[in-house]
């Protein structure tokens, strides 16, 4: 196994966009299992490993949960996704309080829609692209390197007093 673990970037997620009244138990379970249960279990395993390090209090540690701007707002046809991302924001806060005594910081990074091959088909639909871009005051999608830079910052000593909070990278979506 790993000799030590200092940083976890906990990133898992899926969405099945559909109206609230049409969500099946199967789809609810699929999204909850990946977006909440898997992230919980990965964090739990990582913390167990982190706590095995004898000098943890002086060495420190960081858990970075990748959530979404949707963990701070609501949106139509994204009820289950919003529910799960709000849950991880809550997990982030609870773990930050519980793990502070071990000098393990727990934060989240909450990006807006990102320009990736996975989102490309969604933005090929003009009505969806307009709906999203109309809600981002900066008028553009996020880039992966912007999220990566945030991860580097939150994992670093530059963020040594930052715990229990969310770094929202959304071009102003949640500011409205």
Give, region by region, the residue ranges found by the protein language model.
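A conserved structural motif in NAD(P)-dependent oxidoreductases
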Residues: 136-147
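Residue(s) in the substrate-gating loop at a strand-loop-helix junction
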Residues: 68
């Amino acid at each position: 196994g790993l000799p030590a673990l200092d940083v976890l970037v906990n990133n898992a997620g899926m969405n099945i966009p559909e109206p609230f009244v049409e969500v099946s138990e199967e789809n609810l379970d699929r999204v909850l299992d990946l977006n909440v249960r898997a992230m919980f279990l990965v964090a739990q395993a990582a913390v167990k490993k982190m706590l095995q390090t004898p000098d943890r209090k002086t060495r420190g540690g960081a858990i970075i949960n990748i959530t979404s701007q949707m963990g701070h707002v609501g949106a139509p046809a994204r009820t289950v996704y919003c529910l799960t991302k709000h849950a991880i924001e809550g997990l982030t806060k609870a773990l930050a309080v519980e793990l502070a005594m071990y000098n393990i910081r727990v934060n989240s990074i909450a990006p807006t829609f990102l320009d990736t091959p996975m989102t490309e088909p969604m933005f090929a639909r003009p009505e969806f692209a307009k709906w999203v871009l109309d809600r981002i005051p900066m008028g553009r999608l996020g880039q992966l390197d912007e999220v990566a830079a945030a991860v580097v910052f939150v994992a670093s000593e530059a963020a040594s007093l930052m715990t229990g909070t969310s770094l929202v990278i959304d071009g102003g979506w949640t500011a409205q």
